[in-house]
C-alpha cells in the first residue's frame, strides 16, 4: 500500500491470530506484545508510540466454546489493563481492535440467549467495565450512548448479517483525557469481505 509503513505481529502458529498496523506517520518506536511470556506467542498486540499518544492495536483472545479459555482470558484482561495503565501514566493511549466482548446488552442483538456464550459472559463484560472505570472511554458509546443496532461482527450462520443479528466487539478506546478530542466514531457496517466490518475514529491529536 503506497505511502504507508507496515508493522506485523504474527502468531507462532501459522494461520492463527496476529495483528498489523499500517501508518502514514512514522512512529517514534514500535513494540510487539507487552512483556509477559504467557502472552507472547499469538501476535496479539502492537504498540506504536507517537509524539502525543500511544496507539495499541489488539486482538483479544476468544474464550472459546464451553469457555475453555475463560481463565486465560481473565488473566489476559488483567495484564493488558495493567499495561495500558502503565502507558497512560506517560502519555494518552488509543486502544483499538477486536476486543472480543459485547460490553452492554445494547451492544448485541440477542443478549438473553448469549449470556454464557464467549464474548458476552458476565466475567468478560465486568473486565471491560473495570478497564473503562480505570480512566478510559469507549469512543462510540461516548458519542452515541443510546444507539441501537450498531454492530461490528456477525456470524456467518443463520443469515445473521442480513438480519443485522450482530455484536459490537470492535472498539476504539481512549484515555479519558482525550475524550474532548473525539470528533467522530463510526462503524462502517456496509463494508463487506469479512464477518467483521471496519470501525473508525476521528480524533483531534
How would you label these PLM feature ranges?
Residues 2-5, 76-165, 169:
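Metal-dependent phosphoesterases centered on the DNase I-like endonuclease/exonuclease/phosphatase
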Residues 24, 48-51, 175-176, 201-205:
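Active-site beta-strand termini and strand-to-loop segments that position acidic
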Residues 1-63:
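Structured beta-strand-rich core segments of catalytic domains in phosphoester-bond hydrolases
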Residues 14-30, 148, 157-180:
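Conserved beta strand-loop-helix elements of the APE1-like EEP
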Residues 35-36, 61-77, 112-117:
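Surface-exposed cleft-lining segments at the edges of enzyme active sites
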Residues 186-205:
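Surface polyanion/phosphate-binding segment centered on an Asp-His-Pro turn
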Residues 9-12, 36-37, 161-164, 189-192:
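Short Gly/Pro-enriched turn/cap motifs at secondary-structure boundaries
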Amino acid at each position: 500500500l503506497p505511502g504507508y509503513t507496515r508493522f506485523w505481529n504474527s502468531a507462532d502458529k501459522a494461520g492463527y491470530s496476529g495483528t498489523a498496523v499500517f501508518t502514514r506517520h512514522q512512529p517514534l518506536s514500535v513494540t510487539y506484545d507487552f512483556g509477559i511470556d504467557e502472552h507472547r506467542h499469538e501476535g496479539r498486540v502492537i504498540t506504536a508510540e507517537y509524539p502525543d499518544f500511544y496507539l495499541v492495536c489488539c486482538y483479544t483472545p476468544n474464550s472459546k466454546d464451553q469457555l475453555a479459555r475463560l481463565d486465560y482470558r481473565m488473566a489476559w484482561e488483567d495484564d493488558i489493563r495493567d499495561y495500558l495503565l502503565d502507558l497512560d501514566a506517560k502519555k494518552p493511549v488509543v486502544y483499538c481492535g477486536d476486543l472480543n466482548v459485547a460490553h452492554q446488552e445494547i451492544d448485541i442483538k440477542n443478549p438473553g440467549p448469549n449470556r454464557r456464550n464467549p464474548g458476552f459472559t458476565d466475567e468478560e463484560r465486568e473486565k471491560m467495565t473495570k478497564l473503562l472505570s480505570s480512566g478510559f472511554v469507549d469512543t462510540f458509546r461516548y458519542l452515541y450512548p443510546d444507539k441501537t443496532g450498531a454492530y461490528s461482527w456477525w456470524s456467518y450462520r443463520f443469515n445473521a448479517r442480513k438480519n443485522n443479528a450482530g455484536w459490537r466487539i470492535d472498539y476504539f478506546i481512549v484515555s479519558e483525557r482525550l475524550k474532548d478530542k473525539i470528533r467522530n466514531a463510526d462503524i462502517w457496517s456496509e463494508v463487506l469481505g469479512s464477518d467483521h466490518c471496519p470501525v473508525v475514529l476521528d480524533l483531534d491529536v
